[in-house]
């Protein structure tokens, strides 16, 4: 959090409230700039973290088949409108030479990459590319489904609509059977 200028955020929030015609001195808004600054520091904490750090410790196991962590909840902020989007990520990889990561590391990588002004497409690619670089697996497949408040609260105003993005790396780019297999596991309840 030390790289985030909380006072600057507080001033900006005051300016926004004044610009929309609010009285920043009324009781309900007195601490709002401070609360918003703390919230942004938390929501953008991924700007000052590197998801690769989670994969510096690996394990060597006799396993070279699918590893899938499903339904990883996440939230992020749309970089176009600075409103939230949230959903779940499904992260799969096939280990190479038995190199595996702790399962929680996949969720932590999603969280770190999502906690910054973002696009869903970039989160999907960044998660896959981070795993490819750090674990050198035979393949990675990432699917993210999310609801975007910029489509729910404004513009299109379609609550409940979901955006789905996917990225295939390694064997998943070339092998349709493997792709279908991982998608069938993702769709299982």
Swiss-Prot record:
SUPFAM superfamilies: Tetrahydrobiopterin biosynthesis enzymes-like
Entry superkingdom: Bacteria
Keywords: GTP-binding, Hydrolase, Metal-binding, Nucleotide-binding, One-carbon metabolism, Zinc
Pathway noted in the entry: Cofactor biosynthesis; 7,8-dihydroneopterin triphosphate biosynthesis; 7,8-dihydroneopterin triphosphate from GTP: step 1/1
Entry EC no(s): 3.5.4.16
InterPro entries per record: GTP-CH-I_C/QueF, GTP-CH-I_N, GTP_CycHdrlase_I, GTP_CycHdrlase_I_CS, GTP_CycHdrlase_I_dom
Biological process per Gene Ontology, one example term: one-carbon metabolic process
GO CC annotation, single: cytoplasm
UniProt catalytic activity: GTP + H2O = 7,8-dihydroneopterin 3'-triphosphate + formate + H(+)
UniProt key word Zinc-finger: no
Gene Ontology MF annotations: GTP binding; GTP cyclohydrolase I activity; zinc ion binding
Positions of Zn(2+) binding: 78, 81, 150
Oligomeric and partner information: Homomer.
PANTHER family: GTP CYCLOHYDROLASE 1 (PTHR11109:SF7), GTP CYCLOHYDROLASE I (PTHR11109)
Stated family: Belongs to the GTP cyclohydrolase I family.
Protein name: GTP cyclohydrolase 1
Species: Lysinibacillus sphaericus (strain C3-41)
